């Protein structure tokens, strides 16, 4: 498969999980395309099946804040069309789910189908996502995702308690690469 992954490229939990998942998928011969504003810090080795696509937002004096959400949606459209992505996996709902939804709508008008899965990681729901300035967009984007996962049962319950979610949320717990971590005496 050709898989797009949108994530924060930092050492935070969602970025680490997304990058490690992408690396594992690439080892299984899937083509993985990371779409983000800088190369993920955990992309620390070469793999011929991993690609990085940088998102850059126009720095224009009119904008007090760069419109990253729009730039991300445009980059998703470009990568999906050029690379013929089969699916997109976005990690952390803000702003990735709404950017994916916008990109999906644009692509649909061009005759291209791109399903996307949103993985909820924590503060995108429990802290930032609940803020009234983001909540309606987060709720709408989650409900319009083709699939939704949560990294824990507790986060799933928090999401259902604080948002009007009509989609099923599948719990897929965080994982550990046991080849990297071994018990010591």
What are these regions (language model features)?
Residues 48-77:
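A short, charged, and often flexible helix/loop element on the N-terminal side
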Residues 106, 114-131, 147:
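A short, histidine- and acid-enriched strand-loop-helix "catalytic/donor-clamping" loop
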Residues 128-129, 160, 175-185:
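Acidic anion/phosphate-binding donor-loop and adjacent secondary structure
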Residues 131-148:
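Membrane-proximal helix-turn-helix segments that form the acceptor-binding/catalytic region
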